[in-house]
């Protein structure tokens, strides 16, 4: 699998620069990107949209103005690289369609010389925009001194009057024109939209499992304590028909014993019904809670569950269904099978209800 080539990213960036500058009909657009090694803003890419003095091409047919501007931007970059390499390397034969310095207008020279500039954060228009994370709008760039605008001399020669630097997610977009334009916030939003729309927005912050901001309100921190009212229709009372079928399958040969068990079960069921009716006024489990829990309201967002509030259901963490059942009040029917050693059943004659003690 081949790795993505840098040209793909450069083409995408240049397309955004082209769309932005052509939408407002300004002279040029640049992108200053941060250099990780030196932590300074350097030329990333650009698009020239201004006047052209001499057009050179090897294409036999006439091209559109958009294609000509794109080709011009590439030729200007190649000319700068050629001039930079010529200082250390012997001159090489260049294609006949390559530009020469005498082929450029003053605005093209301004655009070409921008490639050689760099700006530490906080220095120059791009550096200030990057450090402050706010746009910088300079009207009269050709009239100020070099302390205000380091490229003021070049701007005066090229008649660049307005320069705007707009910080984006990973750099600064600079856009300039030969017209004098006053600051316009809608213009800033318009230009920035070409670059923000091509970046995925960061996800909304979510509470981590270590967050101290109301952890019970996070979906990852649903309290393990649940209180429900036992529904008489859903309580576990042995069904007489099911018991009869089980007894017939298990003891088909012993009809006398099965009949006696049926009578016994009917007696127990009648006794359980009377117990249920006696315990009807009190369906909720009464739990003694500390005062700090009682003070907290269910809607005040407080987390008073950190107090000494212990329930027996802690031992049932391995079985979630049993853990929930431990906080519900259920009515138990007769227990026909012998109890194991881990359970003890006590019958209170005062309230006629069963309690299971683990």
Curated annotation (Swiss-Prot):
Residues 241-264 have a biased composition (Acidic residues). InterPro entries: MYC/MYB_N. Pfam families: bHLH-MYC_N. GO terms for biological process: flavonoid biosynthetic process. Residues 230-271 are annotated as: Disordered. Keywords: Activator, Flavonoid biosynthesis, Transcription, Transcription regulation. It comes from the Eukaryota. Non-functional truncated transcription activator. Belongs to the bHLH protein family. Corresponds to one of the seven genes studied by Gregor Mendel in 1866. The wild type purple flowers (A allele) have a functional BHLH protein (AC E3SXU4). This is Truncated basic helix-loop-helix protein A. The lineage of its organism: Eukaryota, Viridiplantae, Streptophyta, Embryophyta, Tracheophyta.
